[in-house]
Amino acid sequence: MGPGVTDWANAATSWLGYNATYPLTPCGYCNEFGNFTGVKDLVIQECTAQDGTNTVATHTFKVPRWRGFDNPFGDIWTNLDGVVIVRAAANEISTVYTTTNVSEFTDVVGEKTVAGYEVASDGYIKAFDLGETAEIIPSAVGGSTTTYICDYHYCNTSSTALRTLRVGGDALYGGIAGLGSFNSSGNGVGYAYSNVGFRTLNRVS
């Protein structure tokens, strides 16, 4: 799937200047691929940056669609509903709680169940802990951009706050981003920023 929408700098002459690190890819951009997999060019034309002074040069992204999902990684971070991560003490592994019950998509552990345990180290992922309902949770680091999982894990080992989970990476993360990129780096459950979003589902009856 190539680099996806992950290879733009966060600068006044690139992503920051273009739209202040908000999403780049229009919804449904790769719908022509249906439920299949493919890559489509997205061209950002040269324009004046938001500061009115700098120029944003033309940039071409390779937008991936994987089995019907646009941008399975990149563009912006995806915040996952129904996940709360808890670390009892600094530098210890974290417990990952999940649920598929929409009434439990809250900012507390509540009735969520333990899906697995997250390693207390940042780095390229070497192994996953696999949950009973297909959760993949980094259990070891020590890989690289070309070995093992090839995606990055952030966790902020000193944080003991309840944390949310972001996955995928955004438009400036390059080789750190990917399908398995896992970021619980101390961002509390109420974290919000321009480069973080979520996926929605439309049920057609």
Which role fits each region the language model picked out?
Residues 15-16, 32, 36, 56, ...:
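C-terminal, surface-exposed recognition/capping segments
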Residues 1-119:
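Functional-site microenvironments in short loops/helix caps that host divalent-cation chemistry
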